[in-house]
Amino acid sequence: MKDNVHPNYKDVVFHDVTSDFKILTRSTMTSKETVKWEDGQEYPLIKVEISSSSHPFYTGKHKVIDTGGRIDKFQKRYAR
């Protein structure tokens, strides 16, 4: 493998600001912000607006929003 070709892969903390969930993982992303983790070390902090901790699909709080009766119209058209 060639030297200096691959990105720097290191430990980072992802922070879901919606649910205040933090996870320590590895990534090539960088950040000027740092956070002190449970092990006492400081890691780069990557803030995200949505993750599996707050996304409706993963939390089970998914809602179907019917705009203008489109679902009813579809069901009437294709009802058997």
Curated annotation (Swiss-Prot):
Gene3D superfamilies: Ribosomal protein L31
GO biological process, one term: translation
Pfam family, one: Ribosomal_L31
GO cellular component: ribonucleoprotein complex; ribosome
Molecular function via GO: structural constituent of ribosome
Presence of the UniProt keyword Ribosomal protein in the record: yes
Cross-referenced PROSITE patterns: RIBOSOMAL_L31
Keywords: Ribonucleoprotein, Ribosomal protein
HAMAP family: Ribosomal_bL31_2
Complex and partners: Part of the 50S ribosomal subunit.
Record-stated family: Belongs to the bacterial ribosomal protein bL31 family. Type B subfamily.
Name of the molecule in the record: Large ribosomal subunit protein bL31B
Gene name in the database record: rpmE2
